[in-house]
């Protein structure tokens, strides 16, 4: 386990309370936005959230659910990165069991503490192996159905880098999520595109204060706009600065 920074602890607390409130709501496909700047440790914070909820819900009198099934969807190869990170972060506690599709229990569905990691590109096509029907009936949608019916678990989907599911991917993303029908969608991004009443924000300055990321670097700070230079482009100003320096030498 790693020690969380103060802003990370605060974000996890807020996410946890909002998640419990939303689990108590009977509506499906509720959206919880988690906005944090790049470098803030979003994977660590979300993993900690899942760990704490998995351990605390069975003893929590506030929530109508004592167990939850988790599905973590990420673009490109980020799901593998998050999968490995979670295995490393929580290897001692063993409250969470990160799994890939082939490692799941396809007879009874996802179990409490299972976190299914999926690559977005592997499920966003009609002929994708995880989606299309087969003789063994081993599909993502059948796995989710069994999780809900056999295990009686609500499904929470973590959408990592949520902004990448928008634009030309928006229609297909909606079709997949509509088929999964999660109870909650935790949408994680530095630049989220979805709007929701439920949101947790990590301020960039708080991350900078903890020295997790640095302030923006000002390139060529001595190149200032002035009345004389106002009509010049940036490149022209840089060139003029270089020529002036050359004359000095």
Q: Can you describe what each PLM-predicted range is?
A:
Residues 91-139:
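Inter-Walker segment of RecA-like/P-loop motor cores
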Residues 196-249:
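Conserved interdomain linker/interface between the two RecA-like ATPase lobes of SF2 helicase motors
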Residues 122-184:
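SF2 helicase catalytic motif II
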Residues 25-49:
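Walker A/P-loop
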Residues 2-28, 119:
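N-terminal pre-P-loop "Q-motif" helix
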Residues 167-216:
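Post-DEXD/H (motif II) to motif III coupling segment of the RecA-like Helicase ATP-binding lobe
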Residues 43-48, 58-94, 119-122:
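Conserved Walker A/P-loop ATP-binding site and its immediately adjacent core
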Residues 76-79, 121-124, 163-164, 191-195, ...:
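Conserved nucleotide-binding/hydrolysis micro-motifs of P-loop NTPases
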């Amino acid at each position: 386990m790693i020690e969380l920074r103060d802003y990370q602890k605060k974000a996890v607390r807020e996410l946890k309370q909002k998640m419990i409130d939303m689990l108590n709501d009977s509506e499906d496909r509720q959206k919880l936005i988690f906005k944090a700047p790049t470098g803030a440790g979003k994977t660590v914070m979300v993993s900690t959230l899942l760990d704490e909820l998995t351990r605390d819900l069975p003893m929590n009198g506030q929530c109508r659910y004592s167990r939850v099934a988790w599905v973590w969807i990420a673009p490109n190869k980020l799901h593998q990165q998050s999968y490995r990170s979670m295995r490393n972060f929580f290897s001692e506690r063993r409250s969470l069991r990160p799994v890939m599709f082939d490692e799941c229990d396809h007879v009874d569905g996802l179990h409490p503490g299972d976190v299914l990691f999926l690559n977005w590109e592997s499920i966003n096509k009609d002929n994708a192996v995880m989606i299309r029907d087969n003789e063994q009936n081993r599909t993502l949608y059948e796995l989710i159905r069994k999780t809900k019916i056999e295990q009686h678990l609500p499904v929470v989907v973590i959408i990592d880098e949520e902004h990448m599911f928008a634009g030309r991917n928006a229609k297909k993303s909606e079709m997949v999520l509509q088929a999964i029908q999660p109870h909650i969608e935790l949408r994680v991004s530095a630049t989220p595109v979805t709007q929701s009443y439920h949101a947790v924000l990590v301020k960039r300055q708080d991350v900078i204060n903890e020295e997790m990321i640095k302030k923006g670097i000002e390139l060529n700070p001595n190149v200032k706009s002035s009345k004389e230079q106002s009509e010049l482009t940036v490149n022209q100003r840089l060139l003029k600065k270089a020529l002036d320096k050359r004359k000095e030498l």
